[in-house]
Amino acid sequence: MEDVNAYMEIIKENIEYEHHMKYGRWQDKGLYEELYEVICEIVCVKHKTVKIGGNDYPYELVKSKFLKLNSSHLEYVIGCMQETTTKIANIKAYMVTALYNAPSTMNHYYQQEVQHDMYGGGI
């Protein structure tokens, strides 16, 4: 149980949980809380593998990536989910996949947004 509490505190610090609960947009607080809970569950409940986008990944790899998530990654996931108009059948699996992929896709996403706004008729 000590490890679980330690991991939960590390995650809270990494994602600036207290700051977002105190100063974040009220409509995003519930979403932030849910993402925090999903991260904690993935990190604290040991499995042989974790299913990400239909594929099984080694637990230790997923745990390592989830322990590196920060507030920017969560804000990116929340933003992407708010823009999604497609019906999501398994919201938890979608959240896990989005969190796992956030560090690998976030910078390219924002770069593409800038390119579109500057040169693609977005302005």
What kind of region is each of these model predictions?
Residues M1-I123:
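Electrostatic interaction modules used in gene-expression and signaling proteins
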